[in-house]
Amino acid sequence: MFRYLTSGESHGEGLYVILEGVPAGLKVDLDYINHELSRRQLGYGRGERMKIEKDEAQILTGVRGGFATGAPITIKVKNRDYENWEKFMRTTGEIEPGREVTVPRPGHADLAGGLKYGHKDLRNVLERASARETAVRVAAGAVAKLFLAEFGVRIYSHVLRIGSVEVEYPGGLPEEELKKADEHPLRCLDAQVEGRMLKWVDRARENGDTLGGIFEVVVFGLPPGLGSYVHWDRKLDGRLAGALMAIPSAKGVEIGDGIALANIPGRMAVDEIYYENGHFYRKTNKAGGLEGGVTNGMPLIAKVSLKPIPTQVKPLKSVDIVTKETKPAQVERSDITAVPAAGVVGEAVTALVLMESFLEKFGGDRIEETKRNYQNYLQSIANY
């Protein structure tokens, strides 16, 4: 069974992830993991934290000589800002006063988390709830991408919307175009539309505001048959949507044409099936590569809508949990928009879900065993 668990706080010593079930023999490329971490820090409109942190991974366990041993893999991403926070975040001894939070920020987990766990200092909530945690999800996702690459699977993301400025690509984008997303400051592939997006970000910065948007994840090279239609909790679209919704600020997930399919007649909402040269195919991909919770061999496409980051430079009204007086909400460092970076996180969590699905389908304690099972499956469907 493949699974992962993260730990750590935003201003603690570091962030950690443990991955269990990675097949022995998989090549684990530290440079590639660090490359993926650097991609998460890309994007116009990022906050001051990105000037402090240059995320780099340390592989602590489960890898020897660059290859997975089959034991749990532990990865650490150090928080460089910890040296400024050690006296406020140390795990033993007394915590020095000065960084307490008693005024919750609307739109964050602060108040709900304080009520749930009984914290009187809401820093205990916001430190763990912070989007900083996604750094180790990206590190874990990099390992999953390395695994999927062994089977020819490629994952990309790009930005479709910032604020009210949106670009549409009827029929989707070719893989060669998607490879270029990181060359653009907002990871939007339409330069003209991106120019308008950049102006929106600048305007939001001037106004002390934040912006949400939409990113899209596209996966090529998946075989048909991942996931299941047999039980609700094994449907791949449900599991994928859950992982994408767990990205901070995510408020909606669409698979394929998603919500737009609700507005058209049924005959226009499905992808007709054709057969030629020994294989089944479709001329359209409105389903986004998933039918009945199972991959159908077409590219997997998912869109994620993000709300604006709720932390505001001009704080909103809140209530002090100690005095119960109305006060301005706590102000923390924040991005103007995190949509470009969230796309990279989206790639990572998609890769993790797909790796889990691959190992459920093909098994294998060793990567050679998984590959052999995969090739046998491809042969069986070729003869269908």
Curated annotation (Swiss-Prot):
<dbReference type="GO" id="GO:0008652">
    <property type="term" value="P:amino acid biosynthetic process"/>
</dbReference>
<comment type="pathway">
    <text>Metabolic intermediate biosynthesis; chorismate biosynthesis; chorismate from D-erythrose 4-phosphate and phosphoenolpyruvate: step 7/7.</text>
</comment>
<keyword id="KW-0057">Aromatic amino acid biosynthesis</keyword>
<keyword id="KW-0456">Lyase</keyword>
<comment type="function">
    <text>This reaction introduces a second double bond into the aromatic ring system.</text>
</comment>
<feature type="binding site">
    <location>
        <position position="46"/>
    </location>
    <ligand>
        <name>NADP(+)</name>
    </ligand>
</feature>
<comment type="subunit">
    <text>Homotetramer.</text>
</comment>
<dbReference type="Pfam" id="PF01264">
    <property type="entry name" value="Chorismate_synt"/>
</dbReference>
<dbReference type="InterPro" id="IPR020541">
    <property type="entry name" value="Chorismate_synthase_CS"/>
</dbReference>
<keyword id="KW-0274">FAD</keyword>
<keyword id="KW-0285">Flavoprotein</keyword>
<dbReference type="InterPro" id="IPR000453">
    <property type="entry name" value="Chorismate_synth"/>
</dbReference>
<dbReference type="GO" id="GO:0005829">
    <property type="term" value="C:cytosol"/>
</dbReference>
<protein>
    <recommendedName>
        <fullName>Chorismate synthase</fullName>
        <ecNumber>4.2.3.5</ecNumber>
    </recommendedName>
</protein>
<feature type="binding site">
    <location>
        <position position="292"/>
    </location>
    <ligand>
        <name>FMN</name>
    </ligand>
</feature>
<dbReference type="InterPro" id="IPR035904">
    <property type="entry name" value="Chorismate_synth_AroC_sf"/>
</dbReference>
<dbReference type="GO" id="GO:0009423">
    <property type="term" value="P:chorismate biosynthetic process"/>
</dbReference>
<feature type="binding site">
    <location>
        <position position="40"/>
    </location>
    <ligand>
        <name>NADP(+)</name>
    </ligand>
</feature>
<keyword id="KW-0288">FMN</keyword>
<dbReference type="GO" id="GO:0009073">
    <property type="term" value="P:aromatic amino acid family biosynthetic process"/>
</dbReference>
<feature type="binding site">
    <location>
        <position position="333"/>
    </location>
    <ligand>
        <name>FMN</name>
    </ligand>
</feature>
<keyword id="KW-0028">Amino-acid biosynthesis</keyword>
<dbReference type="GO" id="GO:0004107">
    <property type="term" value="F:chorismate synthase activity"/>
</dbReference>
<dbReference type="GO" id="GO:0010181">
    <property type="term" value="F:FMN binding"/>
</dbReference>
<comment type="similarity">
    <text>Belongs to the chorismate synthase family.</text>
</comment>
<feature type="binding site">
    <location>
        <begin position="128"/>
        <end position="130"/>
    </location>
    <ligand>
        <name>FMN</name>
    </ligand>
</feature>
<keyword id="KW-0521">NADP</keyword>
<feature type="binding site">
    <location>
        <begin position="307"/>
        <end position="311"/>
    </location>
    <ligand>
        <name>FMN</name>
    </ligand>
</feature>
